[in-house]
Amino acid sequence: MAEPLLVVGLGNPGPNYAKTRHNVGFVVADLLAGRIGSGFKAHRKSGADIATGRLAGRAVVLAKPRTYMNESGRNVGPLAKFYSVAPADVIVIHDELDIDFGRIRLKFGGGVAGHNGLKSVAAALGTKDFQRVRVGVGRPPGRKDAATYVLEPFTSVERPEVPTICEQAADATELLIAQGLEPAQNLVHAWA
């Protein structure tokens, strides 16, 4: 039997961060947990909250690190080891400043573009070669600091679109699992 895929939604714990741009990974992970009919529970050995089940015919471990974003690898590394998941079988769902608001992009490996959550995961896995579901939050307006921007709630104009965007990111994750990177990219990257 194949080892499970590890699907990690990045975010910050606690209600103060729940509706921020940086937490779209958590929102998508919650949607995926609903799709597999599983709730999150604490995983003692890793410190993350996990839900297990099947997505697109594959065994998956969904995870939400309980550390702050910049230390996500502290939970992801031990989880990957515990479940014997190779880095290439890790899918990280995260916010992306370099993609326009509402766009979803799939990627394998490459740089971390200043995203400290990705940097922490890459350090814990010992490689940047893992799969990513990138949820576009766009660049901050004017001269606003990017670190401040991602920790702010979505604007009143953006907020009504967020549930649909997160559902699309969950759909993209399922396509990635079902079809592999290139076929899923061809479909997802064509979405308006």
Curated annotation (Swiss-Prot):
InterPro entries, sorted: Pept_tRNA_hydro, Pept_tRNA_hydro_CS, Pept_tRNA_hydro_sf
EC class of the enzyme, as a word: hydrolase
Kindly list the places in or outside the cell where this protein is found, as annotated in its UniProt entry.
Cytoplasm
Q: Site (Discriminates between blocked and unblocked aminoacyl-tRNA): give the residues.
A: 12
Q: Which domain of life is it from?
A: Bacteria
Q: Under the GO molecular function aspect, what terms does this record hold?
A: peptidyl-tRNA hydrolase activity; tRNA binding
The UniProt transmembrane annotation reads: none
Q: What reaction(s) does this enzyme catalyze?
A: an N-acyl-L-alpha-aminoacyl-tRNA + H2O = an N-acyl-L-amino acid + a tRNA + H(+)
The EC code for this enzyme is 3.1.1.29
An annotated GO cellular component: cytoplasm
* Single GO biological process annotation from the record: protein quality control for misfolded or incompletely synthesized proteins
- Which key words tag this protein in UniProt? Cytoplasm, Hydrolase, RNA-binding, tRNA-binding
Active-site positions on this chain: 22 (proton acceptor)
Q: Does the keyword tRNA-binding feature in the UniProt annotation?
A: yes
Entry-linked Pfam families: Pept_tRNA_hydro
The positions annotated as site (Stabilizes the basic form of H active site to accept a proton) read 95
**For binding tRNA, which residues are annotated in this chain's numbering?**
17, 68, 70, 116
Q: What family does this chain come from, according to its entry? A: Belongs to the PTH family.
Quote the subunit structure annotation: Monomer.
Question: What does this gene product do?
Answer: Hydrolyzes ribosome-free peptidyl-tRNAs (with 1 or more amino acids incorporated), which drop off the ribosome during protein synthesis, or as a result of ribosome stalling. Catalyzes the release of premature peptidyl moieties from peptidyl-tRNA molecules trapped in stalled 50S ribosomal subunits, and thus maintains levels of free tRNAs and 50S ribosomes.
Q: What is this protein called?
A: Peptidyl-tRNA hydrolase
